[in-house]
Amino acid sequence: MAQVYNFSSGPAMLPADVLRVAQEELRDWQGLGTSVMEISHRSKEFIQVAEQAEQDFRDLLEIPSNYKVLFCHGGGRGQFSALPLNLLGNKTTADYVDGGYWAASAVKEAKKYLTPNVIDAKITVDGKRAIKPMSEWQLSADAAYVHYCPNETIDGIAINDTPDFGDAIVTADFSSTILSHPIDVSRYGVIYAGAQKNIGPAGLTLVIVREDLLGKAHVSCPSVLDYSVLSENDSMFNTPPTFAWYLAGLVFKWLKTNGGVAAMDKINQQKADLLYGVIDNSDFYRNDVATANRSRMNVPFQLADSSLDKLFLEESFAAGLHALKGHRVVGGMRASIYNAMPLEGVKALTDFMVDFERRHG
């Protein structure tokens, strides 16, 4: 079978080693004669899987002991509702930083529960899209919390600053950048991430929440979104997505075996440098994000002649480079190069790009 590299933004590529283990264990897990998908989430065997996955996740991000880790349903969009329902309390507003598509989506959902103070952080620097430094964000004094998205998958924009807002409760959607670089978890009240990019398959959402923020949910908050209920029940208030949880655990083990988050950080920088280098050294390709705010996870790029887009996608697919079509909102191309994408995959893409330019430029 020819080598295929999947550049999908999510559900995304999983590590080959993880898929191999899952395949080997699929029909007979740990000698039980059944699949891990078939055993009770309350069995001692699955409890062991769940506890080990949480511990490995804590180790990878060095999560302080005063934070709870929740394995949830609902995806990132579910957390758009969970945040105000759990954190608003008796306040009526929260600060929402708009840096792109997903941050704006969080604002739209939040309006069902509060009146957001929207901070438009989008700016232009030398004709390229960028984000205001955090020091220029105008937070309000009466906000229940501040929310932002550190990495915008569609726009290819990253916010790399570490938040330092005093006593403000900082919440963040880390869906597309979790585990790709070190995070100072202590700077946040809530971190959440859909699993389908850097953690595992779709269907699982991880939430890291500071313990002092528990117990404040609105009376109308659905139990499946209530952080306290989930914490008190070890994320098993209802049946969790057990297979996704198991696979996430395999990914965490793979990360630890391969040097952890620090090693991923270095490799991800190498991959991004290689791809952006080809784009920047060409008049055939372009990226319209300022260097300081370029995403290392999602690299959108345009061809100078858009009439070649269809051919580029056809030829790249035939070459084993899949899912390079850009999001419908921005068009063009997009290469998502999460942790599971090896450097060899990015090298294969850049070699193809150089050759395509030679033939059609």
Swiss-Prot record:
Binding site residues for pyridoxal 5'-phosphate: G76, R77, W102, T153, D173, Q196, N238, T239
Main location: cytoplasm
SUPFAM superfamilies from the UniProt entry: PLP-dependent transferases
Compartment(s): Cytoplasm
Annotated GO biological process: L-serine biosynthetic process; pyridoxine biosynthetic process
Listed cofactors: pyridoxal 5'-phosphate
Subunit structure: Homodimer.
Family note: Belongs to the class-V pyridoxal-phosphate-dependent aminotransferase family. SerC subfamily.
Function: Catalyzes the reversible conversion of 3-phosphohydroxypyruvate to phosphoserine and of 3-hydroxy-2-oxo-4-phosphonooxybutanoate to phosphohydroxythreonine.
HAMAP family the record matches: SerC_aminotrans_5 (MF_00160)
NCBIfam families: PRK05355.1, serC_1
Protein name listed in UniProt: Phosphoserine aminotransferase
Source organism of this protein record: Cronobacter sakazakii (strain ATCC BAA-894)
